[in-house]
């Protein structure tokens, strides 16, 4: 089996060199995220294993959950790709971010390791509301919300008064309870 040793990223078109020295070009469906250990099938039927390459990263740890959560919040606020681990965060090496995280009380260590950031809440890449895919993204977010809450409702009137009401619904096969939705 041949191997691609490449930074794993959500690219539609990817040029890589296999461990055999062979140059290859990949064309992947939009939103595909290659992960370490994935296996691709070449046009000739050959199998190619994906191996995450080592790169300069920051390993972020904290003395407590609150400090690590604050670090994650500030990284997310900057749209920084982050790999979430048990008790640590991993991100691309960036001295400015290392300084910020240290000032927040985190312990930051520079290392060389594979980096596989989270794909995002709804899969695919990072997009903003002005993109052509906003309607598609918004519909997906609404679908996830409706699946979680088991219902949907809308309000087309002014919100300058209280209109509290209850909905009974289930959150899972064994969880049934009244759930209050107070809207202002």
Swiss-Prot record:
Q: Which Gene3D superfamilies match?
A: Urease metallochaperone UreE, N-terminal domain (2.60.260.20), UreE, C-terminal domain (3.30.70.790)
Q: Which UniProt keywords apply?
A: Chaperone, Cytoplasm, Nickel, Nickel insertion
Report biased composition (Basic and acidic residues) as residue ranges.
Answer: 157-171
Compartments it resides in: Cytoplasm
| One Gene Ontology CC term in the entry | cytoplasm
What GO biological process, any one, is recorded here? protein-containing complex assembly
MF GO annotations: nickel cation binding; unfolded protein binding
Instruction: Note down the stretches annotated as region Disordered.
Output: 147-184
What the protein does? Involved in urease metallocenter assembly. Binds nickel. Probably functions as a nickel donor during metallocenter assembly.
Similarity remark: Belongs to the UreE family.
User: What protein am I looking at?
Assistant: Urease accessory protein UreE
Which species is this record about?
Answer: Burkholderia mallei (strain ATCC 23344)
Organism lineage reads as:
Bacteria, Pseudomonadati, Pseudomonadota, Betaproteobacteria, Burkholderiales
